[in-house]
């Protein structure tokens, strides 16, 4: 259960989570692939979510991802990001890591209302390279 008290978080707390979904256009934005690989290099289970993607390599939505996701890494425009936040609320996904350019005041407010912990930062900066 997500509670309103969980509405803020720091990146180091989220980076300890083991199961991630990276939401972005994996075919058009090379940073999305870099984020996925960086998380995997740290032993994370990472699901690729791309509304324009092609299964089975990518899931169309968070609802299609098997199992429980602990953290979503958001790498889409803020308008699409609002849809992702709504899916997170419906699925009970408690953590949102927002990459530069993907955030908005609306996303922050909606996360707070849903009790989703939100951190704005960059996985590539906050998670060192070359772990495994």
Stretch-by-stretch model annotation:
Residues 1-52:
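Hydrophobic, well-ordered beta-alpha structural blocks that scaffold small-molecule cofactor pockets
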Residues 100-127:
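Rossmann-fold NAD(P)-binding glycine/threonine-rich loop
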Residues 29-31, 54-58, 102-107:
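Short, charged/polar "capping" segments at the starts of alpha-helices
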Residues 34-35, 83-88, 107-110:
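A short acidic, amphipathic alpha-helical/loop segment
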Residues 45-46, 52-54, 58-77, 118:
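Mobile, glycine- and charge-enriched loop segments
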Residues 62-102:
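Mid-chain, well-packed structural core segment of small domains
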Residues 44, 91-96, 114-116:
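A short helix->loop->beta-strand "cap" motif at the edges of active sites that frequently abuts
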């Amino acid at each position: 259960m997500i509670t309103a008290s969980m509405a803020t978080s720091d990146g180091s707390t989220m980076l300890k989570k083991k199961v991630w979904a990276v939401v972005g256009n994996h075919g058009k934005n090379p940073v999305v692939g870099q984020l996925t690989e960086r998380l995997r290099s740290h032993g994370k289970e990472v699901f690729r979510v791309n509304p324009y993607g092609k299964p089975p390599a990518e899931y169309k939505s968070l609802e299609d991802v098997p199992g429980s996701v602990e953290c979503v890494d958001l790498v889409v425009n803020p308008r699409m990001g609002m849809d992702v936040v709504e899916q997170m609320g419906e699925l009970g996904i408690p953590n949102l890591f927002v990459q530069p350019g993907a955030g908005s005041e609306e996303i922050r407010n909606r996360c707070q209302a849903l009790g989703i912990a939100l951190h704005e930062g960059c996985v590539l900066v906050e998670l060192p390279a070359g772990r495994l």
